């Protein structure tokens, strides 16, 4: 059977001499599979090592700073071709040479190395303040996507996926070369690529084909089989484990092929403390958490909420707006008896007035009764009209069998963990001032503190100041009120509300977008409120924005009078700086930012 030639044209930037040696090696390997030659007679293992070494030398000579990526792609394509030619043969004709036995393990090593370098390209760019161009980032994301999918089914026939990996890698290399010719790549980005795209270690790749007796490469099948069984990371089976030594390098969130949509980053310095402060001990839960809690239906507690009810939580058909002068409401309740009306009046009279907020529902007169005779004598105050207008626009009535307060909801980490809704304040924080008028308690509008990202001028303010209501005008007590006026609590001075800040407080979606924007700017700016936060006793922001070692490398490169040829051996100072990248303390912080924020839209691919 003749060898497949569809993969020989996908190699990147090879000289004609290397292509000729490659074609001869693939032909001899197919002849070994057909039992026309023996593997020892044509030295398949040694020639495979030499061709992989030629890939690395060619990439170092002409691949510039991203030569490691080119060498990895060429080696991956070479072993994929050997793998595809092996599976096309029958079982009795295949698997009688060292390369055929060790091919799955070598393929696993190459794919793991490709995933490591592409992951590091995205993970460690924010920690070192490296801006990735849009075209290069999009092409690199496609390459990472195809490589990760292949890593889970590497033992099967690669076929089309091999072509997809090589096509994506070729697109990345072409974008890098084009932008390099146009002078659009900075020295910092090129140094970052040289550090990220490392070359595969051939000694580790061919460790399964080294004889335990002589210490050299061998084509003895028995010796290779015995060596594979003793390796800790290799598995001589049809389906090896999905994870390899990369599990100790990559986090669990990056080992998934399907990314989870996260609207707002969670694991940011100071966000957990703010979350605990806002959640509190009682009454602290968002709309989404309360909706999926085990405490019953969500609309039974919506009297305590400030925002409008969600469309997914419809009110009961009987819960409609009822005003004193509404004729439609009185006509709809024509069937109510005098007994029901008296029971409602007695229940309203016996309920405490200064405790939890009551329902805004008024007594509904029967047919023929004059509606609201007490309000006709006194002029309607402007604050009363505002409350009536708010009640008409937002009819919310609690269920009689349910309590009028929102019970605490147990927070479950990782389950529907989002900050879409607005948090409820604590009852003792003075967020609502109640007024009693004619046996009916009216609650003034409350201002609920939304989520503010670390670094926002509102993030370091005390919680009572953020929860304090802004007085809209003088509140006049009614003349006929028998209850004493509530004593106002001393409130902390509220910060000056600018038009931009008031717009952020009113629109939760805009607040979320501003939070994401602020978190993206944390990698480039220093938080100016660090000293103010320590004085106020609020969040202690001891985690400054990440500052990677590439800043030192950039300073060194800019201080040089002549251009540095990165293809030549680097100075000891630069080598020391590059070696310290692996121990960068900002890697974990940048990992959360890169995985939490959607850098590229996955729906486009």
UniProtKB/Swiss-Prot annotation:
Organism lineage string: Viruses, Duplodnaviria, Heunggongvirae, Peploviricota, Herviviricetes
Composition-biased stretches (Basic residues): 355-364
One Pfam family per UniProt: Herpes_TAF50
Role summary: Immediate-early transcription factor that controls the initiation of viral lytic gene expression and lytic reactivation from latency. Triggers lytic replication, and initiates a cellular senescence program in epithelial cells. Up-regulates human DCR3/TNFRSF6B by directly binding to its receptor. Globally induces a proteasome-dependent loss of SUMOylated proteins in the host cell and the loss of promeylocytic leukemia nuclear bodies. Improves the stability of the triplex capsid protein TRX1 by reducing the ubiquitination level of the latter.
Signal peptide: none
Source organism of the structure: Epstein-Barr virus (strain AG876) (HHV-4)
Record family assignment: Belongs to the herpesviridae Rta family.
Disulfide pairings: none
Keywords: Activator, DNA-binding, Early protein, Host nucleus, Host-virus interaction, Transcription, Transcription regulation, Viral latency, Viral reactivation from latency, Virion, Virion tegument
Basic and acidic residues bias spans: 341-353
Cellular localization per UniProt: Host nucleus; Virion tegument
One of the GO BP terms on file: regulation of DNA-templated transcription
Subunit structure: Interacts with human ATF7IP protein, leading to promote and regulate host genes in virus-infected cells. Interacts with RNA polymerase III complex; this interaction downregulates small RNA transcription and 5'-pppRNA production.
GO terms, molecular function: DNA binding
Name of this protein: Replication and transcription activator
Regions of compositional bias (Low complexity) in chain numbering: 321-338
Chain residue ranges for the region called Disordered: 307-381, 447-509
Coiled-coil stretches noted in the UniProt entry, renumbered to this chain: none
Gene Ontology cellular component annotations, sorted alphabetically: host cell nucleus; viral tegument
The organism's place on the tree of life at top rank: Viruses
